[in-house]
Amino acid sequence: MLHLVVYDISDDGSRARLAKLLEKFGLQRVQYSAFRGELNPNDREVLARQVGKFVRDDRDCIFIIPLCQRCSSTAIVISNTGVELVKEKGVEFV
C-alpha cells in the first residue's frame, strides 16, 4: 500500500539519518521532510519501530500515513520543480 511519511525532527543529524532510513525502505522524497512510497504491512511495522528512536523531544513527530488507491489517484500536486512526484492516473498538477 502507498504511504506518506512526514516528520518534524529538531536535530539535524537525526533528521538526516531518518531520511536515509526512509530511502532504504524504498521511499521517495517529495518534500524536505516528506517521503512517499509502497510499504507492505510487515515493512510498515518494522519502519514504525525503527523511526521511534528519532523522536527525542517534545517537538519531534513522525507520521506514517497509509494512502488508499482512490485517495492517491485524486491528489493535487502544486509544484514547479518539473520532478515526477507521482505516477498515478488522475493526479492533477497545478
UniProtKB/Swiss-Prot annotation:
One Pfam family this sequence matches: CRISPR_Cas2
InterPro entries hit by this protein: CRISPR_associated_Cas2, Virulence_VapD/CRISPR_Cas2
GO biological process, one term: maintenance of CRISPR repeat elements
Residues reported to bind Mg(2+): D8
Keyword Hydrolase (UniProt): yes
Disulfide bonds: none
Needed cofactors: Mg(2+)
EC number, UniProt record: 3.1.-.-
An MF annotation (GO) of this entry: metal ion binding
UniProt entry keywords in alphabetical sequence: Antiviral defense, Endonuclease, Hydrolase, Magnesium, Metal-binding, Nuclease
Keyword Ribosomal protein: no
Subunit structure: Homodimer, forms a heterotetramer with a Cas1 homodimer.
Role, per record: CRISPR (clustered regularly interspaced short palindromic repeat), is an adaptive immune system that provides protection against mobile genetic elements (viruses, transposable elements and conjugative plasmids). CRISPR clusters contain sequences complementary to antecedent mobile elements and target invading nucleic acids. CRISPR clusters are transcribed and processed into CRISPR RNA (crRNA). Involved in the integration of spacer DNA into the CRISPR cassette. Functions as a ssRNA-specific endoribonuclease.
Similarity comment: Belongs to the CRISPR-associated endoribonuclease Cas2 protein family.
Protein name (record): CRISPR-associated endoribonuclease Cas2 1
UniProt organism field: Archaeoglobus fulgidus (strain ATCC 49558 / DSM 4304 / JCM 9628 / NBRC 100126 / VC-16)
